[in-house]
Regions:
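A short, Lys/Arg-rich alpha-helix, primarily the initiator
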Residues: 1-20
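Short, contiguous strand/loop micro-motifs
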Residues: 4-5, 30-34
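Residues within the helices of the helix-turn-helix
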Residues: 8, 19, 31, 45, ...
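Alpha-helical residues within the helix-turn-helix
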Residues: 12, 23, 49
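Residue-level detection of the helix-turn-helix DNA-binding "recognition helix"
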Residues: 12, 26, 35, 63
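Short alpha-helical DNA-recognition segment
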Residues: 15-31
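Short, basic-rich loop-to-helix N-cap that marks the start of a DNA-contacting helix
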Residues: 36-49
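Short C-terminal boundary/hinge segments that cap the last helix of small helical domains
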Residues: 52-65
Length: 65
């Protein structure tokens, strides 16, 4: 299972909010990420480039429950 918990921590450290992601991607994509639903790697790439962070700062892989 993919978790976006690292992204929310990264945003807090950067002094940003989820709504700031709307400038990078759509509100629908942010909503999907809030529910840990899959998004494209292109979206992850755009977030990483915009925030100046690595993939590990955006997603983590967790074992299925």
């Amino acid at each position: 299972m993919i978790s976006y918990n690292p992204l929310w921590v990264t945003l807090i450290k950067a002094g940003k909010q989820k709504t700031d992601l709307y400038e990078i991607t759509s509100s629908a994509t942010v909503a999907k990420m809030s529910k840990n639903e899959p998004v494209s790697l292109r979206v992850v790439e755009q977030i990483c480039l915009s925030l100046g962070c690595g993939v590990e700062d955006v997603i983590e892989i967790l074992p299925d429950e």
